[in-house]
Amino acid sequence: MSDFPLSVRNASISFGERTVLNHVSFNVLPNRILGIAGPNGSGKTTLLRSLFGAQPLHEGEIRLFDVPLKKLKPSQISTQLAVVSQFEYDASRMRVWDLVMLGRAPHRKDMQGYSKVDVTHTQRALSLVGMSDAKDRYLHSLSGGERQRALIARALAQDCPCIVLDEPTNHLDITYQHQILALIRELSTTAVIVLHDLNLVSRYCDDVIVLKDGKVACYGTPSDVLTPSTIRETYDIDTLEVRDSGMKQFIFRG
């Protein structure tokens, strides 16, 4: 029995002659946040989508709580793994409350409506992301940041042991970027997060994978992996490492 909530072995994906993921392997440790970083086109979103079955592997295997992902039905995956994706369906005529309540759908035993437990989870999720007062608003009336927080609330309402998030800080101002990532840390859940901002990776992630050209360029803790030399090798940009209140930060130089 594996101790890893998610395990990826030799994951490979190609589109035509272009290899997007090239024998990627890693484990996601329980109750830790794994950041996925790398330059544009390095395979981050493709890798994340493969973790919940949206993008099938051409080679290799992904295991969710030691069960091969390809053997699980979507309904089974959705009780174990919540998703915040960059690519969401158009639900602009839906209310915030209804969107977040959809997170409870995998737990419904029948089609007779939602239970008091479902309502409690939905209320809690909205409160956690600061959207309680917006529960009756329609999605089309929300700003990009508000809509992003509503999507995160839906994933939290799902109450899964794992959550994967693709650029969850998109459309959020600096305050909410830190609030959302701090919240995920406080929940002590197992999380996999694609992030472009290496300073956010350094501050909030326990472990990090840096992809380059579809391969794992480096894998470890942010303090070990994120250094000016590895950033230079991966991103082809110079950085100055500084300390801010004991936290490692990078200043990017042209």
Regions found by a protein language model. Name each.
Residues 37-39:
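The feature captures the beta-strand-to-loop junction immediately N-terminal to the Walker
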Residues 163-167:
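Catalytic Walker B motif of ABC-type/P-loop ATPase nucleotide-binding domains
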Residues 6, 20-21:
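Conserved structural motif at the start of ABC-family nucleotide-binding domains
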Residues 228-254:
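ABC ATPase nucleotide-binding domains
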Residues 60-68, 77:
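Conserved ABC transporter NBD signature motif
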Residues 52:
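Helix-to-loop junction immediately C-terminal to a conserved catalytic motif
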Residues 101, 116-134:
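Conserved ABC ATPase "signature" region
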